[in-house]
Amino acid sequence: MFTGLHDILIILFLLVTLKIAQNVDHTKFLQKYGYLTSGDNQLSSESLSDALKNMQRMAGLEETGELDERTIQMMERPRCGHPDVEDHQKSRGKRYAPPQFKWKEKIITYGCKAVGTSTRISLDDLRRTMHQAASQWSELADVEIVESSVKNPMMVISAGRENHYPCTVRFDTKTLAHAFFPTNGQIHINDRVQFAMTNYTERMGANSLYSVVAHEMGHALGFSHSPDIDSVMFAYDTPRKWKFTSMDKYNMRSYYGAKASKKENEEEERKTENEDKRRKTEKDRGRTREHESDDIRPNECRVENPIVVQYRGEYLIFKSQWVWRVSSDWKRLIIKAVPINQLFPGLPNPIDAAVTVGHNLWVFVGEMIYVIYGNHMVHAPLRLSDIGINEKYVDLAYEWHYFNPPAVYIWKGSRYWKLDEKMYHRRVDERYPKDTDLNWARVPKGVHSAFTYEKEIHLLRGNQVFRMNSSRSVFDIADGYPQPLQSFFGFCPRNEKLVLNSSSSHFSLIYATITILILIF
């Protein structure tokens, strides 16, 4: 009996030891790729959960904050050795390298270094894949990436094993390669890996050398990792037909300038012209788009027909080409109205709708969806059709806290869709669209925006706010509503709100008087 108990205790001890070792390995992973500070051995459960959520977001996984099976499997996959979170990103919250990490020249040279001790990757393989990657990247911007025989080319690619001198970053068994930002430009390929000479990785264990080289060249050009699995800058070499996404192209052009192309210019002009026509002829919208007045900074206390969204514990208010931030209790104006491009670089305007989806902000402009984390776009813009909505634009979007976690709904006309949380909000639920009259028959006609306050949906029509009461069996308008939007603005002087509220009351009084006169006569 004693022997049996002794054996059980030994097994339990080994299992606990194995579990601790696994956790240590996963902590080292998070430290290696920038999610945790190296050397921090006293981690709180909250900081570890936050690090896991950030890692999961960059890996395209559900952000559980837990070391679940899918997360562990992703950590075990071959990947690039470059950190996912740079030091400058920790301080600035940016997802891409800042502009100083780029080449200033229009002609960027590269060289292929003799492999030396390599037994798997030949110099010809490196030259061929570098030429292919350089040609592809060069097509995206006003820059030429060319092989050169000069003594010190700007980029240098070589292959090596665990300790590859003079690099101080050691390869491990799961690292395919790593590279360094300008003006270092070094690209190192792990010679221990058996690479396939294909254009993309077709299956696990057959990593494409070209895919890896194209990715590492992106780092050598100044770009960080992207959470978009379709992007060339996705950190994990997953079997897929990767491509240069719209965000990859946008970043390349923003760093190195766009190529002058008559065809592209004509196409862009045609798109702009069509967009102008679309916006001018939309008569079924619930709000009027301003044109000449867009350049005038709006009065935050007298705004009309804005788009309001709750994001990161505060409210964003969009109006034409402007945006400002308000505290979650509506009492403080955090920043006054600034151009949208100043707060969200690259975001077009005016916007149609906005909603928080997980940790991201989704902004709808025409048929495009811009996904923002912090104040920067995290991947290429989506189209409405990408998530299963075949419309040219949407009217409004909101989070509904009737569910836990909150559900995300998108409206257009008399139909609405729900994002499918099982698909990580990448598609709408296949049971939709549905008619708004099914559950929302009491919503007033002509609403143009929606936001969440005190976990209840608030709908905007003009300057009127309708609070929907989800605690009742029938979703109707809460008692005491509608109210003027300005009644929420605790940051405005009292006389500003009085003027606006009295204007609304005055209009209601006139309307009531006319109604009474009609009934009398």
From Swiss-Prot:
Q: Motif Cysteine switch: list the residue ranges.
A: 78-85
The consequence of inactivating this gene is: No defect in anchor cell invasion. In 7 percent of cdh-3 and zmp-1 double mutants and in 25 percent of cdh-3, him-4 and zmp-1 triple mutants, anchor cell invasion is delayed.
Binding-site positions, Zn(2+): 80, 215, 219, 225
Per the annotation, which location comes first and is thus the protein's main one? membrane
* Annotated localization: Cell membrane; Basolateral cell membrane
- Per the record, what is one GO cellular component? basolateral plasma membrane
Provide one Gene Ontology biological process annotation.
Answer: proteolysis
Compositional bias per record (Basic and acidic residues), positions renumbered to this chain: 261-298
At the top of the EC hierarchy, this enzyme's class is hydrolase
Q: How does it sit in the membrane?
A: Single-pass type I membrane protein
Q: Where is the signal peptide?
A: 1-21
- What tissues harbor this protein? Expressed in the anchor cell. Expressed in the anchor cell throughout the L3 and the early L4 stage, but not in vulva precursor cells P6.p, P6.px, or P6.pxx. Expression in P6.pxxx cells begins in late-L4 stage. During L4 lethargus, expressed in all four vulE cells, but not in vulF cells. The expression in vulE cells persists in adulthood. In males, expressed in the linker cell (LC) from the early L4 stage until LC death during the L4-to-adult molt.
Spell out the catalytic residues.
216
**Sugar attachment sites:** 199, 469
Function field: Metalloprotease which, together with cadherin cdh-3 and hemicentin him-4, plays a role in anchor cell (AC) invasion during postembryonic vulval development probably by promoting the degradation of the basement membrane separating the gonad from the vulva epithelium.
User: What is the protein name given in its UniProt record?
Assistant: Matrix metalloproteinase-A
Name the gene behind this protein.
Answer: zmp-1
